[in-house]
Amino acid sequence: METEMKILIGLSGGVDSAVAAYLLKKQGYEVTGTTMSIWDNFLPAPKTKVNDSCLGPENENIETAHKIADFLTIPLYVTDCSGEYKKVVLENFRNEYKEGRTPNPCIRCNAYIKFGILPAAVKKTGLSFDKFATGHYANIGFDSSTNMYKLYKAADLNKDQTYFLYRLTQKTLSETIFPLGIYTKEQVRNIAKKIGLPSAEKPDSQDFYCGDYNDILQFPANPGNIVDKNGRVLGKHNGIWNYTIGKRKGLGLLGGTKDPLYVINISAKQNMVTIGTKEDLYSSSLTAKKVSWCSILPPKKTIEATAKIRRQHKPEKAFIIPQEDSSVKVEFAQPQMSVTAGQSIVFYKDDTVLGGGVII
């Protein structure tokens, strides 16, 4: 083993990245930490605990990261990525909601900020390192038969984070280490407690932002109609960005209805929200664009795989059909509920992440 290899690890102040840093140091690597700063008080502070989300006041997290670095006796650099984060992640977040889509900012952040701008910014300071590591639950391997790096699911399938990592490139995979991929969350917690890490009891973050999304969107009211499938007006909305596919509560309907109703379509062009029954939420196919193949070359013909249309979605059998414009059509073996434009669909073959794209 190359004990002199230099590893830069992203330290969030949480237990996962702290244990990852500990494991790397224990294996003999020269470890340096970096903490990404993305908060510059451009929004009112969310009224919740700091560690409930990624985006929010981060003084406590940075302080904890320093304590972790001191505990592990490794250097720590705080890297300001707030400008890039606003431009790359938050502007896209606002634009997508304005168009009636529901984005996943964590996927975009991973692809462009955490695994791109963050390590690149540290390199610009003159610090040299061989690999970049994080506390994500995922695995990376090299397939000599295809001469390609592969992204694999984590051992702990309940904590597996590959859904958020499908946009990592071959170059990024070749430069990345995921020390926690072979561990369960319980094992990670136990390691943290056993060695007395400062973040051992810290709860997991729950979302990218724990306040009202309108804090970020800041759109003026734009009233429009809520209609049924036949175009009959059932109510009014103040902005399509307040709705997502599958939403049931707080729809703003004028009167009671016999059956539960759900949002089944959002049209930015018509400034209209369409509602229907639960049965109307099911789709047997979808189209995805901005497709990224992380572990294989772009397929030229139909492939069979399993697909997830959201983080908590159980992978379902599907056929991925490449299109001439580099998008893909996905046909499911069984209809799927709440296919949502703006969310990502991720393709798997057993434990291998093939790639994914953005649902349109």
Curated annotation (Swiss-Prot):
InterPro entries: MnmA-like, MnmA-like_C, MnmA-like_central, MnmA-like_central_sf, Rossmann-like_a/b/a_fold. One of its GO terms (cellular component) is cytoplasm. Its EC number is 2.8.1.13. CDD domains: MnmA_TRMU-like. It is an enzyme of class 2 (transferase). It comes from the Bacteria. ATP binds at G10, L11, S12, G13, G14, V15, D16, S17, M36, G135. GO terms for biological process: tRNA wobble position uridine thiolation. It catalyses: S-sulfanyl-L-cysteinyl-[protein] + uridine(34) in tRNA + AH2 + ATP = 2-thiouridine(34) in tRNA + L-cysteinyl-[protein] + A + AMP + diphosphate + H(+). SUPFAM superfamilies: Adenine nucleotide alpha hydrolases-like. Pfam families: tRNA_Me_trans, tRNA_Me_trans_C, tRNA_Me_trans_M. Disulfide bonds join C109-C210. The keyword rRNA-binding does not apply. Belongs to the MnmA/TRMU family. HAMAP family: tRNA_thiouridyl_MnmA. This is tRNA-specific 2-thiouridylase MnmA.
